[in-house]
Amino acid sequence: MKITQLETLRLGEFPNILWVRLHTDEGLVGLGETFMGAQAVEAYLHEWAAPRLMGQDPLAIEARARDLTGYLGWRGSGVETRGNSALDIALWDLFGQAANMPVHTALGGKSRDSIRVYNTCAGYQYIRSNVNQSSSNWGLGNPSGPYEDLQGFLHHADELALSLLSEGITGMKIWPFDIAAEQSHGQYISAQDLDSALEPFRKIRQAVGDKMDIMVEFHSLWRLPMARKISRALQEFDTFWHEDAIRIDSLDLLKQYAEDCRALICASETLSYKWGFKDYLQTG
């Protein structure tokens, strides 16, 4: 089997998403995807990646990954990495089709029959534009349907928690601190802004008690001093995890943050490649 074509698809309705289709001479087509900076990633794929993939064996996935890793730009999570990630997904999709089995089976099989679900409280228009990752791109103000959960957690988190529980969902992730972080570049949060951001947590606990686990997303917007202050303020609400509370340019800072955080810590969304995860895990 040989790769014959690299096709990319971008939809005007979802300009942040790029779909990648790898065609083969046997008629199989592998599907991959990536998010953010779609136009730049698309250009990289056609300029750099496609010439290195044409005529190659798609089932030799490690060899294809080696061929796509150059000397510049492959340590962080920028355009090259996101493009290669989409290709990796497409290659594994081809592998599963060729083997006539789900990829998870080829990799050793499932370890459980079900997994708990939590709700990321976003809305229909959330980060749909490719402008930026900020509150200005949340798509608030014009609900597009009944499940506008971002507006829900900001203004009636109690009702949202009750609605989720009624559907058997016992975890919800919210990010009420982002607006304050954007105002100060993560360097300061006033007592008033802190109190306002804590209001959704109060409403959830008053409405459903401890029946709902609350996960907190910070989008890597805070500097360490304010992140620690917020973490201490959240202790009374027994939050389940804190996700990307600070930029982890320095993993030592994450370890300092953990000293004030009773919740579990999630911090892998901005990492890339196995080396980034290795360094992260070694922090303990």
Region locations from a protein language model:
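Short, Gly/Pro- and small/polar-rich lid/capping loops
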Residues: 1-21
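Conserved, mostly hydrophobic/aromatic
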Residues: 3, 27, 49, 87, ...
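Short clusters of small/polar residues that mark proteolytic maturation junctions
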Residues: 8, 33-34, 122
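Metal- or metallocofactor-binding catalytic centers and their adjacent structured scaffolds
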Residues: 23-99
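Hydrophobic alpha-helical hairpins/lids featuring a short glycine-rich hinge
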Residues: 78-114, 122, 128-131
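Active-site phosphate/pyrophosphate- and oxyanion-stabilizing loops and adjacent acidic/basic residues
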Residues: 93, 105, 202, 255, ...
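Metal-dependent enolase-superfamily TIM-barrel catalytic cores that perform enediolate-based chemistry
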Residues: 114, 119-256, 260
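Catalytic alpha/beta core domains of metabolic enzymes, predominantly
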Residues: 249, 253-254, 258-284
